Regions:
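Sec/Tat signal peptide C-region and signal peptidase I cleavage site
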Residues: 26-32
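Conserved C-terminal helix/tail region of periplasmic/extracytoplasmic solute-binding proteins
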Residues: 299-334
């Protein structure tokens, strides 16, 4: 008995539907395979890193074909993880210079803040940097941007760090403020929004370091030379997401302050506004790493090879340059 025309059509339809779902499944698996995983960090709970947070919050990494595991890891720890190949792209300050001087194949691939964005606050009785002679200045950790900035400013005031002014390392901004309040330090270096907390604690701004416009790697993005070479496309996609995060940070103030509040666990309107206005000028459309900023770090590095080292050795702006030449950045702002 021959099958009816209707049953043949039904069988054919069943086969076609089955083939469709097979194709969809294969296609989905192929797309999933194309999504590269990138392990990255942000260095602090500071508004400076809003572009990175926005890239995660707005799914920009996904938009550019990446699955990014972005988490808080302190810069020194992140640098060691990068060297050990446990992170791919990190968010350091001067740690890359120190690692590079020790022979590690690491490079800055983009700037986040290419100058020191911070202030020195001191007890009310201290009127100038010169008054810090014989006193104690608190910074975060050795080799961090606060450490470099302190040394630059003290030398500008003709004071020798470690001799005329004792430097102590208290790890974080909150700990620095606590150290001053407890009498363990006379002054400290702060970034926003801890600057407002310092004011509320009765401390006086001694130096607005930001206004000094000191070229310095306050924060950057970095990787290994091997990663930039072997996974260049992944690094490019990461930077594209970051650049779009910068664009949003610069143009969507209310949303950016909301994201800063989310990550810093801050709801105070004044704190959020202060953070946004502090870091807005530092978010550059094309954040190339300047040689002058690295040179400042070399000038104050304790490593014997620092004096003869060339700042360009620690920089690879090539991916950003390629992105810019493609017209990507201009299109973002149209």
């Amino acid at each position: 008995m021959k099958p009816s025309e209707e049953s043949l059509r039904f069988s054919l339809l069943t086969v076609l539907i089955g083939m469709f779902f097979v194709c969809v499944t294969v296609s989905s698996r192929a797309r999933a395979a194309e999504v590269a995983s990138v392990r990255a960090n942000y260095a602090a709970f500071s508004g400076a890193f809003a572009p990175l947070w926005i890239a995660a919050d707005r799914n920009l990494f996904t938009k550019y074909g990446l699955n990014v595991d972005l988490r808080y890891i302190a810069p020194a720890t992140a640098t060691q993880a990068l060297i050990g190949k446990n992170l791919d792209i990190i968010n350091p300050g001067g740690e890359i210079v120190e690692a590079g001087l020790n022979g590690e194949p690491v490079v800055y691939i983009a700037g986040i803040m290419n100058r020191a964005v911070m202030s020195i606050y001191a007890k009310p009785e201290i009127g100038s940097l010169a008054d810090l002679k014989g006193k104690v200045l608190a910074v975060t950790v050795p080799g961090a941007t606060t450490d470099f900035a302190a040394r630059v400013l003290l030398q500008q005031a003709r004071l020798t760090p470690g001799k005329d002014v004792k430097l102590i390392y208290l790890k974080g901004m909150v700990e620095i403020l606590t150290g001053i309040n407890q009498g363990n330090a006379d002054a400290g270096i702060f970034t926003s929004p801890t600057t407002l907390k310092a004011q509320h604690a009765g401390l006086k701004e001694l130096v607005n370091v930001t206004e000094q416009n000191i070229p310095m790697i306050h924060a950057a993005l970095a990787s290994t030379k091997d990663y930039v070479k072997s996974r260049r496309d992944d690094a490019r996609r990461f930077l594209q997401a970051y650049l779009e995060g910068i664009k949003i940070s610069r143009t969507e103030a209310d949303y950016t302050k909301q994201i800063i509040g989310k990550y810093t666990k801050t709801t105070d309107v004044a704190d959020l506004e202060n953070s946004y206005q502090t870091f807005l000028p530092a978010w550059e459309r094309l954040p190339l790493v300047p040689a002058a900023a690295v040179q400042t770090m070399l000038n104050f590095a304790s490593h014997p090879g620092a004096k003869s080292a060339k700042p360009e050795t620690f920089i690879d702006n090539s991916i950003l340059v390629e992105i810019d030449k493609s017209g990507f950045v201009d299109k973002l702002y149209k």
